[in-house]
Amino acid sequence: MRTSQYLLATQKETPADAVVISHQLMLRAGMIRKLASGLYTWLPMGLRVMRKVEAVVREEMNAAGALEVLMPSIQPAELWQESGRWEQYGPELLRLKDRHQRDFCVGPTHEEVITDLARNELSSYKQLPLNMYQIQTKFRDEIRPRFGLMRGREFIMKDAYSFHADQASLQETYDRMHQAYSNVFTRLGLDFRPVQADTGSIGGSYSHEFHVLAESGEDDVIFSDSSDYAANIEKAEAIPRETVRPAPTEELRLVDTPDAKTIAQLVENHGLAIEKTVKTLIVRGAEEGKLVALVVRGDHELNEIKAAKLEQVADPLIMATDAELREAIGAGAGSLGPLNLPLEVVIDRSVALMSDFGIGANIDDKHYFGVNWERDLPVPQVADLRNVVEGDPSPDGQGTLVIKRGIEVGHIFQLGTKYSEALKCQVLGENGKPVVLSMGCYGIGVSRVVAAAIEQSYDDKGIIWNDALAPFQIALVPLRYETDVVREATDKLYAELTAAGFEVLLDDRDKKTSPGIKFADMELIGIPHRIVVSDRGLADGNLEYKHRTEQDAQALPLNEVLTFLQARVRR
């Protein structure tokens, strides 16, 4: 491809509303353009990259036995009402009416549609297992679209759905898809981690997320430094570093603390070590009108997903209001503690191993210091309530936990029978009796992968693409292309490289565009291999080669260029 025949839409300045590096560089490199909040047009340069992601995804899905389909993006409300999600989904579900006043939505996901297809097409266990996928535009009406493609409203997604007569078959396909996802991200050259995850609003019983590691990531990715254990922050089990509760050394005492409304003030003004403090958080119970106290160490954070899974706690988690606290306890949030508390109490594992610690006295501006379990108050229910922190023991007993930032680019679920029961999707089993189908679902954010790859690989000059993702593998940059000798050599090399199967962008802009601008544009776009043709080099029988990640260029004999690139460029 020649730049004279291409939309080379690079920009020197960074748009003011672009915050994250992928958004900045995709705009500057001429990959995308903003149409409206959370909506982007893919320009030719960006679309070439996304098509490469799609191709790898499609190859691995096909190799895993999945069949490609294409479902409508507009879905009838009846299906969502049948599954119960029409009422459950919030305003991120874009709802509309047609001219006949029938309700529809723009699909954020396709569980209902695929289950409707399966119940109409499948009748016997002999047709199973069946795994179908699509690469389709999705829409979620995010309240605050931001970060470019990282959190837009419209996006491209690969979503697959599998149907099974039993759990063993589902597990087999789930494992195959897990491997297929690992293959996809490995082939794309990404540093990623698959992690155990909570099933969230999709539902189901078992899931894994796939995260591209990047400092700009929104999610914490937890993994062991000595094993393959990995989980997201919602799912990671918190194991206390302590194994035995120390014996008491202090007496219980009631202390005036008008200057300690927070843990930080308690530590600063009263000399307590933060690991000797606790936070008592009051939440609404599963039973109407009931409150429950959750207690974590002062330096730990409550994990709301874990807490909401307690049978006595309302799901989703709802914190008690100040009025509810006053009515039930008679004190404000900064003075609460588990001693003499007229509520059911659940404490974190780490709290159960504390001694000589400080708690709120359930009286405004007062705390108890020197508190000890069993001596001063009984040990209540103990549960895993907190987020893990770096250095915690790995739950599998091997090594300690490391925390990195990650960008979620894939998610796989074992849905079980959640949707098939709701939509009555069943077949005749081997014994001739109806069997409700078990389902799996498997998503990859195709457009998000492009942005995540940039977040993982860039420098102050621009994007650094690997060979698998680059829009073009080779940038061919002639200096003084208007001269016969340079033009003839360049055109001949361009023909040879394209005939050999390389993806080449020939920068044939005229002499009004300086070599410096040409080099800067190619580095901004991130093309991994650059060949410079100049009259001076040709006089010596050489071209100039430079890889995007290298500082210095090297001379390359003209008659060795093809062999060199065939060995260097990964295809």
From Swiss-Prot:
Keywords: Aminoacyl-tRNA synthetase, ATP-binding, Cytoplasm, Ligase, Nucleotide-binding, Protein biosynthesis
Record bears the keyword Protein biosynthesis: yes
Subcellular location: Cytoplasm
SUPFAM superfamilies: Class II aaRS ABD-related (SSF52954), Class II aaRS and biotin synthetases (SSF55681), YbaK/ProRS associated domain (SSF55826)
GO MF annotation, one: ATP binding
Enzyme class, first EC level, given as a word: ligase
GO cellular component: cytosol
Catalytically driven reaction(s): tRNA(Pro) + L-proline + ATP = L-prolyl-tRNA(Pro) + AMP + diphosphate
Subcellular location, principal: cytoplasm
InterPro entries for this protein: aa-tRNA-synt_IIb, aa-tRNA-synth_II, aa-tRNA-synth_II/BPL/LPL, Anticodon-bd, Anticodon-bd_dom_sf, Pro-tRNA-ligase_IIa, Pro-tRNA-synth_IIa_bac-type, Pro-tRNA-Synthase_IIa_type1
GO BP annotation list: prolyl-tRNA aminoacylation
EC number: 6.1.1.15
Annotated Gene3D superfamilies: Anticodon-binding domain, Bira Bifunctional Protein, Domain 2
Keyword Nucleotide-binding: yes
Domain notes: Consists of three domains: the N-terminal catalytic domain, the editing domain and the C-terminal anticodon-binding domain.
Assembly: Homodimer.
Family to which this protein belongs: Belongs to the class-II aminoacyl-tRNA synthetase family. ProS type 1 subfamily.
Name the UniProt record assigns to this protein: Proline--tRNA ligase
Organism per entry: Pseudomonas putida (strain GB-1)
Gene from which this protein is expressed: proS
